Amino acid sequence: MSTYTIPNVIAQHPRGGERITDIYSHLLAERIVYLGTPIDSGVANALIAQLLHLESESPDQEINFYINCEGGDLPSMLAVYDTMQHIGAPVHTTCVGQAIAVGAVLLAGGAPGQRAMLPHARVVLHQPAARGQGPIPDLILQADELVRMRSEIEAILSRHTGRSPEQLREDTDRDRVFTATAALEYGLIDTVLSPRG
């Protein structure tokens, strides 16, 4: 686990003077949401709160969601995904580093025509994994839930990529790594961003 300091930015206040805020608050004021960690329930709650806040401020204005995610908890990701699909504001998604597993679902779930990757970013699709702890009846329940959730993820990705659930199942039996160009061809994104300038 890395430790780092969250940077502060200095912004000019409209009535004169300066205001110091953390970088995430500054980005939020610009309608930018950034996911830079694996997803757990705490991260999901923060993302959902930001999406709901931005939608309440301006329900028709786009939200830019930047993703650099190593994966995470499926139910937590589904809560964020469902919120993205529920709100009226279109969510433009951009992968800036990697979108692994649950991060890939969020990337693909962006507004149609508004899903992008930087040229050296990558997407990894793979099947969900179980924890495998507890008594046998609990393990059976976990396995059943895993099968159900895998089907849900395949249906979601099918809806956003145009690929069949059967093809997605076959393609995710093992880790499948996509470059930006390969993700575009597969239907996970709509564009590969070019360097500015």
From Swiss-Prot:
GO terms for molecular function: ATP-dependent peptidase activity; ATPase binding; serine-type endopeptidase activity. InterPro entries: ClpP, ClpP/crotonase-like_dom_sf, ClpP/TepA. Its EC number is 3.4.21.92. The active site is at 126. It catalyses: Hydrolysis of proteins to small peptides in the presence of ATP and magnesium. alpha-casein is the usual test substrate. In the absence of ATP, only oligopeptides shorter than five residues are hydrolyzed (such as succinyl-Leu-Tyr-|-NHMec, and Leu-Tyr-Leu-|-Tyr-Trp, in which cleavage of the -Tyr-|-Leu- and -Tyr-|-Trp bonds also occurs). Belongs to the peptidase S14 family. Fourteen ClpP subunits assemble into 2 heptameric rings which stack back to back to give a disk-like structure with a central cavity, resembling the structure of eukaryotic proteasomes. This is ATP-dependent Clp protease proteolytic subunit 1. It comes from Nocardia farcinica (strain IFM 10152). The lineage of its organism: Bacteria, Bacillati, Actinomycetota, Actinomycetes, Mycobacteriales.
